[in-house]
Structures are given as C-alpha cells and as structure tokens.
Swiss-Prot record:
CDD domains hit by this protein: Argininosuccinate_lyase (cd01359)
Localization of this protein: Cytoplasm
Family designation: Belongs to the lyase 1 family. Argininosuccinate lyase subfamily.
Gene Ontology BP terms: arginine biosynthetic process via ornithine; L-arginine biosynthetic process
Pfam families reported for this sequence: ASL_C2, Lyase_1
Source species of the chain: Proteus mirabilis (strain HI4320)
Catalytic activity: 2-(N(omega)-L-arginino)succinate = fumarate + L-arginine
Domain of life: Bacteria
Record pathway: Amino-acid biosynthesis; L-arginine biosynthesis; L-arginine from L-ornithine and carbamoyl phosphate: step 3/3
Enzyme class (EC, first level): lyase
Protein name as it appears in the record: Argininosuccinate lyase
One CC-aspect GO term: cytosol
EC nos: 4.3.2.1
Transmembrane segment boundaries: none
Amino acid sequence: MALWGGRFSQQADQRFKQFNDSLRFDYRLAQQDIFGSVAWSKALVTVGVLSQDEQAQLEQALYELSEEVTANPHSILQSDAEDIHSWVESKLIAKVGDLGKKLHTGRSRNDQVATDLKLWCKEEVAHLRQAIIELQKALVVTAEQNQHAVMPGYTHLQRAQPVTFAHWCLAYKEMLARDESRLADALTRLDVSPLGSGALAGTAYDIDREQLAQWLGFASATNNSLDSVSDRDHVLELLSAAAIGMVHLSRFAEDLIFFNSGEAGFIELSDKVTSGSSLMPQKKNPDALELIRGKCGRVQGALTAMMMTLKGLPLAYNKDMQEDKEGLFDAVDTWSDCLHMATLVLDGLQVRRPRCEEAAKQGYANATELADYLVAKGVPFRQAHHIVGEVVVSAIEQGKALEELALSELQKFSSKITVEVYEILSLQSCLDKRLAKGGVSQQQVSYAITEAKKQLNMDE
C-alpha cells in the first residue's frame, strides 16, 4: 500500500507506478533506513509519542529486519512497494501490527531519504578512502622495488628527460593523496543530520535534533529545514571527487597501457589482469587497464547529469531528486572497482629494466644536461639552449647520441666544452643532479618513499 493514498479516488496507472517507483535502486538504502528508523523511534519516546516498551518492540523488530536484509538484500526487489521507506514500514507493520504505523509520526520521506543517503555516503567515503590508501601502498611498494629502474620521462609523448619507474609510481601516489584528502574534506560538510526537518518546514514535535544527530553518528544537525531536505551538495561533492579520482586512474591506466605496448616494452603485465584474442593467438591484451580508462566517462557523466538535475530546482523537495541515486551508486561502485583493479594490476607487474634504460638513452633526453653544463661554464641559458639545439641537429644527422660525438665535434659548437662533459651526459648524472625536493635523484626518491611509508603507516 502507498503511504499517500487517502487523498486519491483513483488508483495510479500501472505505467506511472513503474515510472515513479524507486525500490529497484533505493533498496540499497535499506540498512540506512532501518538505522534511521531506530534513532527516530528513540526520539519519539522523548516527546511522548512512544512509550519505552513500544520503542523497544519497534527496535527489536527493526533489528530483526536488518538481519533479514543482510542475509538476502535482493529479496527486497520481490516487493511491489514504491520505495525503500514504504518497504521498511510495511515489513515493520507485518511484525508488530498497528504499532508500526506510529513510527512515521513527525517524519517525512523528504528528511528520511536525505538522512538515508547521507548515511550511505558516509559509509562509502570510508570505504573509498581505504581503497585509495591500499592503492597508494601498492604504488609505494612498487616504487621501492624499482628505485634503480631508469626510464624516459615524457612531455608531449616525446622523450624528454630520464626519470625512474619509482618516481613515476610516486607521482600517482601524490594524485591519490589529493583524492583521499578531497573525500576527507567533503566529509566535514556531509556529516550533518537532516532528520527532524520534516517535509520542508521542520517537525511539529519538540525533538532534540542534536541528540538525534548523535544517535545517528553525525557530528551535528542541520540548521535550516528547507535546505536540509533539498540539499544534495554532498552528492555533487562525492561525484566530483569520484570524477577527479577516475581521471587520475584513467591517466594511470593510459601510461601503463603505453608502457606495456610493443612499441615501448617497459613492463610486463601479469596474466591475472590480461586477456587474449579470439582470433590472434599471440595477443595479451591489457583489458583491466583499458576498462579502467573506459569507465572514466560514465563517472564524468554521472556528475554532469546531477549538476543538470539540480540547477533549476526551486526549494524545497522535488521528485527530480529521486534521480540523485542511480548515477551516484554507479559512480561510487565504478570508482571503487577501478581502485581495487588498479591495485591488482600492480601486483605481479614486472619492469623490464634493460629495455627501460635503453629507451632512456635514446631521444637525446640528456640534452638539458648539456645546456646546464654550459650554464655552469658561464654561458647564459638562452644561448646555451640554442647551442645544444644545434648540437642535437648535428647528432641526429650523424645518427649518434650526444655522448657518442667526439670532443672535437662538440667543441665546434662551444669552446667551453671539455672532456668532463661525457660524465655529465651519463644517465646517472642526469638523475643525480635533481637533488631539489621532489626531484628524481636517488636521494630524493628514497626520501619520498620513506615519507610515504610513514604517512601510510606501512612500517607498523
């Protein structure tokens, strides 16, 4: 039975009912709805609507219902209830009779669903933060194992300067740290309870909403009932964090797809996260990474859709807000799945160090070192830059690396160049000179790994 039938003389058209009902997706809020109902029953005792015995009966029945949901959550979908609130109430009435009809006193589905969704978001934020931390740990472990794996760094997808695979791993660890901090920051605004705001004007019962918020595990109660039932900023913030996080994972995937390609050959992915071709028996495809990259778009789409849903809504609640859940659920599930899959990809990944080093020596990635060498000899940088550009052109024409050019050839471009230049042009020298904080030198990378392990409590 619908919760609102008294006003109507005709039954809803079945087509409208199917269009209107939300149980097919908001069943995921069952535990939150039950938890909120337990807290609300306690609040009703404080204003004399329920006796202590009645509240105890309701709480016991709600906990029994919670256990049933835990055992078989999909059984909810067998019901023709309009939404999860209707389902919980009908099940409660079936257990305790007319007493169950008293629970909704002073409460609206508007503040109820807002509370349920915030509780769900809080739980998911905790899960996502942990998944991010686990991926960060995997990156740090991979970095520690590959501190000496020299590879080319890229700009414009052109070889630029030598870096290490460890330095690459730590770059993504930093991105993930920002993702985790965004979730932590969003939690400060999410952690307020709307329950007790009624449909829009507040509840008519003198309920202590701050106490109610504490029972629910929120830091405090909201300040304005109109805002409470119509606020979905927390959905936007979580979707925004997910969208940014998925961009980072997509870039991570794209890098590894390239590193794994036959053209680069820097890494070998585990068989556990790759698949083959139905036609070409030699293929080993990076499907896990390609799916991470591909799933990024659906999360961006969920954020855009929610923005568009909310942009024209007047205060307070509107049925449009029912559209907040499907995109959110899918985006959070997708982000979580991709975080776990990225962690799995790193487990078993092998770095082909000889091939990485060979590639790092190509493409004149040490040209900047020659320019810096000339600067140290007193040549202004802009002039040194021009000189080295000419040296590179000459080397390309001869099919040689810079360090393969004879000293006499180098001195044609600048008399400042002497024999020690060959030591400067070595890969190790290129790395060792990057001693400033955040640089790619062994000293800085080792320090960064140590600090990351402290931050992530990896030494405990």
